[in-house]
Amino acid sequence: MSDSAEKVKKIVVEHLGVEADKVTEEASFIDDLGADSLDIVELVMAFEEEFGVEIPDDAAEKIATVKDAIDYIEANKG
């Protein structure tokens, strides 16, 4: 697992208060991890801060799973 993937999973655990073993790459933030729209906004902000990437609203709307977040970050980080 990449360093980015580990950091994404850590952020998800901290922000959503879920067990680490539930945070799989296939896990949907809303359907599997119980996030609501405010949680998603907070996660996006945390990802932006941690990785130094900007995630525009149209891109954030397409990030539905943990893998989506990892893929976006790895494709766009400096």
From Swiss-Prot:
Gene Ontology CC entries for this record: cytosol; membrane
GO biological process: lipid A biosynthetic process
Molecular function in Gene Ontology: acyl binding; acyl carrier activity
SUPFAM superfamilies given in the database record: ACP-like
Modified residues (O-(pantetheine 4'-phosphoryl)serine): S37
This protein's pathway: Lipid metabolism; fatty acid biosynthesis
Compartments in which it is found: Cytoplasm
Xref: PROSITE patterns: CARRIER, PHOSPHOPANTETHEINE
Protein family per UniProt: Belongs to the acyl carrier protein (ACP) family.
Record NCBIfam families: acyl_carrier, PRK00982.1-2, PRK00982.1-3, PRK00982.1-4, PRK00982.1-5
Function as written in the Swiss-Prot or TrEMBL entry: Carrier of the growing fatty acid chain in fatty acid biosynthesis.
Name this polypeptide is given: Acyl carrier protein
